[in-house]
C-alpha cells in the first residue's frame, strides 16, 4: 500500500506537534513528525527500541548524553536503547523528520 502523510494515521503530541504513522508494526515503526519552532518532547529513553532520527526539512536539536547536537536537513542520528534523549526545535521554523524505531516504542517509553 502506498503511504504518505496524506493517508497515514495522524496524531498530535505535546499539544502542538504532529506525527504520522507511515509504518506501524510491533517489530518496527516509521513515523514522520513535525515540531514547530520552540516545540520539544520531554527527556526519556526506551528499554528495547533503537531509534534513528532523520531530518527532512529544517533543523532540530537532540539532547543526547549531556550534549546538544544540531541536526540539519539530510542529517540523521542513531539513539541506542536505554540512552536518555530529548528532541527539540530551537530554530525559528518547523522541523520535519522521520523517526525509525526497532522494535516499536509502543509501551517502551520511560520518563526518568
PLM regions and their residue ranges:
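Structural motif
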Residues: 59-61, 68, 84, 94
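Cofactor-binding loop segments of dinucleotide-utilizing enzymes, especially the Rossmann-like FAD-
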Residues: 57, 65, 100-102
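Ligand-binding loop in jelly-roll beta-barrel domains
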Residues: 81-107
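Short acidic-glycine-tyrosine-enriched beta hairpin
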Residues: 67-81
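A short, N-terminal "cap"/entry segment at the start of jelly-roll beta-barrel domains
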Residues: 1-29, 42, 109-112
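Short strand-connecting beta-turns/loops that link adjacent beta-strands
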Residues: 27-28, 48, 92-93
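Glycine- and acidic-residue-biased ligand/ion/polar-headgroup-sensing regions
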Residues: 48-50, 54-60
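Conserved short histidine dyad/triad with adjacent acidic residue
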Residues: 31-46
